[in-house]
């Protein structure tokens, strides 16, 4: 475990010396270099043994910890890790406890998009939350087939509650936030915390893994819908260069088999679709997406929202007119393509905070 202590939730890591530096930091020979401002976070790594300075504003202490999720160290079978970003107890709150947020970035289950992790965590930290960034299993690190990533999130929720005293967390206010593939993981837990296999896999009771609220950004919810949309493209049967003669259809089937652990039959795809399992046992859920998203089409989110409304789930949904996919906060620090198009989605986090506040956060 790496642990660092700095003097505020706003800090800058620089590779040069500074009169304002409070402490040095390096992790396993790599300097984590970054700039955090109120509206976002840019970061990278500098190779070598260089030391960096953490420059802080005055304020409450901030704690940064990196942990293996399933034991003392990550293993080949259980590779998931998480980072805890926390602040000191609130003196004016009962027991000084804060709400917790668990961040699940997207990345098509092959990796985790960094711009959907730390920037979002810091935004929630700025709003009074203790933040946890989950590095769930991906195809880069292990078996990504259902329900392994979902089990990681279930374990994360249970871990936050089990360590609520140490991390100054209110165990009755644990929110999960997911983007794209991470949104599917969060939606799966929200819909199947009681009926699915996740509690048993996490070694916990169902109540221990139930999130108290859910925020989903452009979630991937329905593999069958995405498959059907992609197979309508007439280019699907053309050979793709540098793939050993595989066609687009071959690659799509390979991907679906990777994430489903099956032959991707209609029945299996429906069974792992969160929409199939929507019930009134779901926690309050906030979901947003973009009408021009070609990767996780908004049309596959509408049935999910409709089912929630039919079941009486507390829910709120927002659809923005443009931005594409992978937007994160939609600001200059998280823009992955056309920043001008992403301006439209920036209000989502303010709307989400208001939703959460209305429901006990």
Language model segments and positions:
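N-terminal cap/lid segment of alpha/beta-hydrolase-fold proteins
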Residues: 59-95
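Catalytic nucleophile-loop/oxyanion-hole region of alpha/beta-hydrolase
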Residues: 112-114, 134-171, 342-344
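Short beta-strand element of the alpha/beta-hydrolase
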Residues: 97-106
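Short beta-strand/loop motif that positions the catalytic acidic residue
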Residues: 287-289
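Mobile cap/lid helix-loop segments that gate and shape the active-site cleft of serine hydrolases
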Residues: 225-277
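Catalytic active-site module of serine/aspartate enzymes centered on a nucleophile-bearing elbow/loop
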Residues: 335-361
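Primarily recognizes the serine-hydrolase "nucleophile elbow" in alpha/beta-hydrolase
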Residues: 158-233
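Conserved alpha/beta-hydrolase "acid-adjacent" motif
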Residues: 294-300
